[in-house]
């Protein structure tokens, strides 16, 4: 821990688009990668014997039209490009309108007297879901349940949500900025409850009020989400909504694959809840993103990772 704290004290933030000299012959500049809040692609200029070459490292390239954050920026040129290609061989396809779809799922679940459990990545995806739910509440798309409670039950997700709240002007897209200009926080709303302690987490499942629970981990292999699944998978009234990729071998993959029974905390739990997956939700660009990088002017070499 002492070593980690020592490293943190040496960190220095650099704004996007500011060209910085690290030492003789080495300069860098960060561009908004549009993947997560604060994610960056790196432009690197190397000069030796009077010759300068520019190297571009993409980092994770964000998906376009994500809520809250800006789309990725693409530089005009580079001599060498090192880029990710997570979904370089496929397209995400047309995106559904998530807000009415989510409102419908919430309405049906709460009407049954159940809970909507959303396994979610703590950084990025959780805040997207809050963005959608704020709009649902603002537009009164769920009827008969007042300001139904929404729990974010993940210490990391709570910390990330606080960071989103504190860095609005720098990183929010035009839609989120327009809400801020009206005095509206894009991810906060009546009925939102942030759970940090284990006692607060345990209390959620002893409250019989139908509710929405957003918790990590997104693939259900660790974290508090496992407790919420144990309390809700056996209930026909409840719904589990997956909003991200589920890797092979994970509990989340087993559930979207139709598992009728799963093991949680050494106990077999019957799967009676409604299992739903939102298509196309990804923080990574599909093939359109990497292709945009290959169109840079004057590139000599492109390396896919």
For each feature predicted by the language model, list its residue ranges.
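Short, conserved loop/helix-junction motifs that constitute active-site signature segments
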Residues: 74-76, 232-236, 296-297
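C-terminal, non-catalytic macromolecule-binding modules
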Residues: 226-271
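Single conserved hydrophobic/aromatic residue that forms the stacking wall/gate
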Residues: 295-305
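His/Asp/Glu-rich metal-coordinating catalytic cores
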Residues: 1-128, 134-143
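Generic long, charged, amphipathic alpha-helical segments
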Residues: 264-290
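A short, acidic, amphipathic alpha-helical segment used as a generic capping/interface helix at domain edges
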Residues: 223-229, 282-296
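Hydrophobic/aromatic beta-strand patches that form the interior of the parallel beta-sheet core
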Residues: 12, 29, 56, 79-82, ...
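Hard-cation-handling environments
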Residues: 105-114, 120-243
């Amino acid at each position: 821990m002492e070593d980690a704290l020592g490293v943190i004290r040496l960190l220095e933030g650099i704004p996007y688009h500011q060209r910085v000299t690290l030492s003789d012959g080495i300069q860098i500049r960060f561009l908004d990668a549009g993947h997560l809040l604060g994610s960056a692609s790196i432009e690197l200029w190397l000069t030796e014997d009077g010759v300068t070459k520019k190297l571009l490292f993409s980092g994770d390239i964000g998906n376009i039209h994500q809520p809250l954050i800006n789309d990725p920026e693409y530089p005009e040129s580079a001599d060498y490009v090192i880029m990710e290609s997570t979904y370089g061989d496929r397209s995400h396809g047309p995106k559904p309108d998530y807000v009415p779809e989510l409102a419908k799922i919430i309405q049906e679940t709460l009407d049954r007297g159940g809970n909507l459990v959303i396994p979610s990545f703590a950084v990025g995806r959780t805040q997207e879901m809050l963005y959608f739910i704020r709009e649902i509440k603002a537009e009164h798309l769920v009827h008969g349940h007042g300001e139904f409670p929404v729990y974010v039950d993940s210490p990391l997700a709570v910390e990330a949500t606080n960071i989103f709240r504190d860095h609005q002007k720098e990183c929010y897209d035009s839609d989120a900025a327009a809400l801020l200009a009206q005095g509206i926080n894009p991810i906060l709303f009546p009925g939102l409850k942030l759970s940090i302690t284990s006692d607060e987490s345990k209390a959620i499942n002893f409250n019989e009020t139908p509710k929405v629970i957003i918790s990590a981990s997104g693939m259900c292999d660790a974290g508090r989400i496992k407790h919420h699944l144990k309390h809700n998978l056996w209930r026909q009234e409840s719904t589990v909504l997956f909003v991200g990729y589920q890797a092979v071998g994970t509990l989340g993959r087993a559930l979207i694959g139709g598992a009728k029974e799963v093991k949680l905390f050494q106990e077999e739990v019957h799967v009676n809840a409604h299992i739903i997956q939102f298509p196309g939700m990804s923080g990574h660009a599909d093939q359109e993103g990497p292709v945009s990088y290959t169109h840079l002017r004057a590139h000599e070499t492109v390396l896919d990772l």
